[in-house]
Amino acid sequence: QAKVKVVEYLSFTCSHCAHFVEEGGKPLKANYIAKGQVSLELRNAVRDQLDMTAALLSRCGGAAKVFGNSELLFATQAEWGGKVDSFVAAQGEKLKAMPMNAQLQAIAKGTGMTAIMARRGFTPAQLNACLISRPAQQHIADMTKEAWQTRKIRGTPSFLINGTAVSGSHWPDLDSALQA
């Protein structure tokens, strides 16, 4: 059990979050987590339906899959994010009129997230089950409320170390705070 607990509030539609994973993911794992000094908890701070879709997919397969799923979604953010405008333009009001679960499934398929997550070994049926899971949706909604309303984070990524907010949102900021 690590003595230092880091909580990261993240959004999959946040380019700064993707940059943090790219810049700080490996050193955080190698220098702190692998040595048993730090544990990391990812908490979603969802901003919209696209973000909710990615958040639900990131948690598909349970706790053991969250980090790998999240890393893949951030690594491919430009790939699926680049399809959003054309997908939304093509779907228009039709998408807005769909029930929430159908929206989530349509977004996942239309942006290519379903195909991306297949790289992690998930079938479309498994991914759809994750997207429409009411307990998973509620869990992410609760994390989001805690992030924005209770903690009043300023943006994503945001970090806590043992419950105390870290000033700054970049890897050097977190690294310095961990060394302090």
Locations of the language-model features?
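Short active-site neighborhood of thiol/selenol oxidoreductases, capturing the structured segment around
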Residues: 2-18, 40-41
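Residue-level signal for beta-strand positions within conserved beta-sheet cores that form or flank
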Residues: 2, 36, 155
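C-terminal cap of thioredoxin/glutaredoxin-like
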Residues: 11, 104-180
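Sec/Tat-exported extracytoplasmic proteins
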Residues: 13, 32, 36, 61-65, ...
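A short alpha-helix capping/helix-coil boundary motif
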Residues: 6-9, 91-94, 123-124
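Structural alpha/beta surface segment adjacent to cysteine/selenocysteine redox centers
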Residues: 18-105
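Conserved strand-loop elements at the edges of beta-sheets that form or border functional pockets
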Residues: 8, 22, 168
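A short, structure-level motif marking secondary-structure boundaries and short turns
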Residues: 12-15, 97-99, 128-129
